[in-house]
Amino acid sequence: VAAPLPRYWTWFDVVSNALGYLPLGVLLALGFLAAFPRRAWLLMATAVALGAALSFILEGLQGFLPTRRPSNIDFVLNTLGTAAGVVVGWGMHRLGVLDALERARTAWLLPHAGAGLVLLAIWPLSLLFPTPVPFGVGHVLDRLQDTVAELLEGTAFAGFVAPSDPVFEPLGGRLEFMAVTTSVFAVCMLAFAVTRRGWHRLLLAPMVLAIGIGVSALSAAITWGPTHAMAWLTPAAEHGLWWAGALALLLAWLPGRLAATLGLMAFAAALMVVNQAPEDPYYADALKIWEQGRFIQFHGLTRWIGWLWPFAAMAVMLRSAAARS
């Protein structure tokens, strides 16, 4: 802690280290205040201390890793992020935000909607890691094929699985349109599968589109720069977004089970198209920036979320479609 401050740092490191611990502070504050509402200041101080202790332990453990170095400025920023989150959580408690959310949950959500809500909350993270086509999460076939071929190399089964061919024909506007339409429509159906029928569903589809566009723009901006934030929005992608939103609004009256069934079909179609997408030079450069550049701390988590998210969503929707009313 008393070591000199690091000579080299970036604003990305400052913001990410502070924001990364903000949700922890919010959750700790809300949990403590819900259990012991009369000891607010003591609980808030305890929450900040717990966040600081967690950061201190994790920074200390980095000293045992060959490629990592502990940083006192990271510890300070993590602690400040926790403190900011505690203040936000205290404000939410004072304003009765939790009570309002509980009433909205009862009015909007179906029973046992927890897994679907978690997946909807994680979906923006899956879009952060570069994809070969907009909203094209679940692009795992090439990696899986290469991994299996590498594992079988030198065995009697070496010829059964060949490494993926890096040369592909361009995906084409029609397939890109189909990939975007089915991917976004499937997320809308996941949202419908966990909510009750009503006017609020008419808000969910625009919210899904707005969040998806915003996170995709953020991913492009932090990869290529702010001037290229909307470079991913090709005419095919734009038309796909319009069609996905329009179809979702037309089907907002569907029962949850039927929405889950349609979403399951849409996810299957999206995965089939996305895994045909080529790894063009721009996509390869984006991967290199994330895997070897300043986002190296985050690429592993976001990559795995992007790979596995649609399959987890399909499992949840399969359970919803098969459940009894």
Model-assigned labels for residue ranges:
Residues 76-79:
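Long, hydrophobic, well-ordered secondary-structure blocks that form the structural core
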Residues 1-67, 72, 83-325:
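Bulky hydrophobic segments
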